[in-house]
Amino acid sequence: KSTLIRHLNRLIEPTSGEILVEGTNVMSLNKQELIEFRRRKMSMVFQRFGLFPHKTVIQNVAYGLEMRDISQDERNKISMEKIEAVGLNGFENQYPNQLSGGMQQRVGLARALATDSDIMLMDEAFSALDPLIRSDMQKQLLSLQSELKKTIVFITHDLDESLRLGNHIAILNAGKLVQVGTPVDIVMNPADDYVAA
């Protein structure tokens, strides 16, 4: 699953096939076009947060904007909006090691939101969190999604989580796609014993 999501933005180079995003074949992009594509079209939230330990919360959130040469005033304005959106107002000057795991994951989410990319890739983003924080993050993601209407590719090994968060689910088993459908389709018409289990 993690390998698949890294193929979507070519963090891992696929050996064959096409990756189509809004009619653009990501496989055909040269290095500079790929950099621009990643900056503008996709953002990623990692399982292990992926935060810079030497940067404050606001600096971490602003990082993608800095890479786009957005002015510091505008970066800070956008970053504070996203920090507030994920419930971390008042923590903008803290460093990652001063935050709980759930708070660090919120910083990662705020950073992904700050770039306003069309597609968010979330790789096991909540799996390292304890169950209560995980449930809270799921609620927050659903709330943000209803407001922002972003495409989110959410990788999880937890079927319950996928059923709660997804409106279109793809199930992989041993690297093979075994079923694609809505949560109701998956539950009511499992493709095989693996999906039914």
Where on the chain are the PLM-derived regions?
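A short, proline-enriched helix->beta-strand linker immediately N-terminal to the Walker B motif
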Residues: 114-118
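ABC ATPase "signature
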Residues: 180-181, 189
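Conserved ABC ATPase "signature" region
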Residues: 24-25, 62, 66-69, 73-91, ...
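Conserved ABC ATPase signature
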Residues: 95-99, 103
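Helix-to-loop junction immediately C-terminal to a conserved catalytic motif
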Residues: 9
